[in-house]
Amino acid sequence: MGIGRSEGGRRGAALGVLLALGAALLAVGSASEYDYVSFQSDIGPYQSGRFYTKPPQCVDIPADLRLCHNVGYKKMVLPNLLEHETMAEVKQQASSWVPLLNKNCHAGTQVFLCSLFAPVCLDRPIYPCRWLCEAVRDSCEPVMQFFGFYWPEMLKCDKFPEGDVCIAMTPPNATEASKPQGTTVCPPCDNELKSEAIIEHLCASEFALRMKIKEVKKENGDKKIVPKKKKPLKLGPIKKKDLKKLVLYLKNGADCPCHQLDNLSHHFLIMGRKVKSQYLLTAIHKWDKKNKEFKNFMKKMKNHECPTFQSVFK
């Protein structure tokens, strides 16, 4: 990650500030020196005339801000560049993006998102380069569409600078370095079997079911999943009267593999969300009580409280 000028792919720090962003960010000093940051900027949310109840502050990035805790620097500014004024709001809004980050759709996803959700402490706001936004969008939106999401208006790339100092990861012409080492597996089926990751998927989903599957067939470019037995863990938008005739869809999944569906003799943990009239599968795991991580998930699920703010995607 670095601060660069987007024109001609040049990178550099044209800022007379001191801040350490680690080896990946151009060296500019220690963030711990800043307890208060006063932004004098003519771009972004500070131009909007919005009244903030508190002046901008430089604060520690908390461990439970999972999206940005390991981004490479330790302090961030509040309000952030998405106009979130409190850490509670930042954590709740950022949690929507953690499952996407885990999909590794682009090498610059975390750098791009954290430059907005958890901007580094400088004497004025520095936005991500437009080309970085476009590269992340072009790589990640196809993955998002498997989950029924599109690139949100709040991250529209033409809002970000082209010819000014901006947050960069690699030069714009180094596209080969930013391409993900991806897989052909349907993204909702490509899940890490870690209790924390399952909890994150649960919170990002609207409903969760323990399910036995009757059959899977292709329909209009999707995989259509017909349940045999189901027990709700989290109903969300599903009405009890509709459970009997519930059908799920793996969006755009007709031709990508989902290895969990190769053997339907198991019970599954199915998570999803409703998009228009369809119930979309957003994550699937074999229901395996013998697995240590799955057992941990079951314990955590009983007491875990998911974020309550409305999703940034809606």
UniProtKB/Swiss-Prot annotation:
Tissues expressed in: Widely expressed. Absent from lung, liver and peripheral blood leukocytes. Highest levels in heart and fetal kidney. Also expressed in testis, ovary, fetal brain and lung, leiomyomal cells, myometrial cells and vascular smooth muscle cells. Expressed in foreskin fibroblasts and in keratinocytes.
Induction profile: Down-regulated in colorectal and breast tumors. Up-regulated in uterine leiomyomas under high estrogenic conditions. Expression, in leiomyomal cells, also increased both under hypoxic and serum deprivation conditions.
MF term (GO), any: frizzled binding
Domain FZ, chain residue ranges per copy: 53-169
Keywords from the UniProt entry: Developmental protein, Differentiation, Disulfide bond, Glycoprotein, Secreted, Signal, Wnt signaling pathway
GO cellular component: cell surface; collagen-containing extracellular matrix; cytosol; extracellular exosome; extracellular region; extracellular space; plasma membrane
Keyword Secreted: yes
Function field: Soluble frizzled-related proteins (sFRPS) function as modulators of Wnt signaling through direct interaction with Wnts. They have a role in regulating cell growth and differentiation in specific cell types. SFRP1 decreases intracellular beta-catenin levels. Has antiproliferative effects on vascular cells, in vitro and in vivo, and can induce, in vivo, an angiogenic response. In vascular cell cycle, delays the G1 phase and entry into the S phase. In kidney development, inhibits tubule formation and bud growth in metanephroi. Inhibits WNT1/WNT4-mediated TCF-dependent transcription.
UniProt-listed PANTHER family: FRIZZLED (PTHR11309), SECRETED FRIZZLED-RELATED PROTEIN 1 (PTHR11309:SF87)
Additional notes on this entry: May have therapeutic use in cardiac surgery.
Family: Belongs to the secreted frizzled-related protein (sFRP) family.
Identification of the protein by name: Secreted frizzled-related protein 1
Phylogenetic placement of the source organism: Eukaryota, Metazoa, Chordata, Craniata, Vertebrata
Encoding gene (name): SFRP1
